């Protein structure tokens, strides 16, 4: 088990550039499957879960390589639709690949995230939504076997505004004929970022950031270049660290509109927080 040793008592002061958001890049990496081409992702954080997602893509026959904080992905040569169990166990969010693989290949097979038995859990929202689009899913024995000769758009009301389910259904709906309307969708900035990437690659999606997302599916997607959203969680962590240590920090590339809840509390506590380009 790793250990962190912190020797406190010092002011935190200086300038830091905010990395790309992990919670944006993971679904976007899954979305590259839909493009069937070459994608360049800028400001991509080199984190364990990102590397795990790359290994999943490579297991499916895709290519990926780093140039600094730029990640190049080519999914043209994708040759598989099954995610190995060992890779599924590496991160719980790996289920996000299900919708994209199903939309591209018409079938997908993977184990339950984390390798545990399926039961009442947020993944049920993913499965019920995919079934609504026309997928046949056998989820016995802890393995998901999914088939869809044809996905068809329809209105889906999520029982809970799950980020993962919203993202998974957005990906699947890109490969569905007709219009899909996701109601009670998650409204996080990372949903908007996924919409931004998909639209850059030729999709037609509106409403991300609100509780209703509309996907007009059946459009051929293509590769492209996209810059990942700055990580609001990392930015908030630096702000709170500076506040607790009595320091002063400048956050480069942070999005002030995504930090309003944190900055409001810091101002109320007596901190001086300013923003702008």
Task: Kindly give the residue locations of the regions a language model identified.
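Short, structured segments at the rim of ligand-binding sites
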Residues: 1-277
């Amino acid at each position: 088990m790793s250990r962190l040793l912190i020797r406190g008592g010092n002011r935190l002061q200086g300038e830091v550039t905010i990395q790309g958001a992990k919670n944006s890049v993971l679904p976007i990496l899954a979305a590259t499957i839909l493009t069937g081409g070459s994608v360049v992702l800028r400001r991509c954080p080199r984190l364990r879960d990102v590397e795990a997602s790359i290994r999943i893509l490579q297991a499916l026959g895709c290519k990926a390589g780093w140039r600094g904080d730029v990640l190049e992905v080519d999914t043209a040569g994708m040759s598989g639709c099954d995610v190995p169990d060992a890779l599924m166990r590496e991160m719980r969010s790996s289920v996000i690949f299900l919708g994209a693989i199903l939309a591209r290949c018409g079938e997908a097979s993977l184990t339950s995230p984390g390798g545990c038995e399926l039961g009442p859990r947020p993944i049920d929202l993913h499965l019920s939504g995919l079934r609504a689009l026309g997928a046949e899913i056998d989820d016995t024995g802890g393995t998901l076997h999914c088939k869809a000769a044809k996905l068809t758009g329809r209105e889906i009301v999520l029982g809970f505004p799950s980020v993962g389910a919203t993202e998974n259904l957005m990906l699947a709906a890109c490969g569905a004929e007709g219009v899909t309307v996701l109601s009670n969708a998650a409204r996080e900035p990372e949903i908007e970022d996924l919409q931004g990437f998909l639209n850059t690659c030729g999709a037609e999606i509106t409403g991300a950031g609100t509780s209703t997302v509309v996907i007009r599916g059946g459009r051929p997607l293509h590769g492209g270049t996209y810059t990942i959203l700055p990580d609001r969680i990392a930015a908030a962590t630096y702000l709170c660290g500076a506040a607790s240590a009595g320091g002063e920090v400048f956050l480069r590339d942070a999005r002030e509109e995504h930090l309003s809840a944190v900055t409001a509390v810091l101002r109320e506590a007596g901190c001086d927080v300013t923003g702008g380009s």
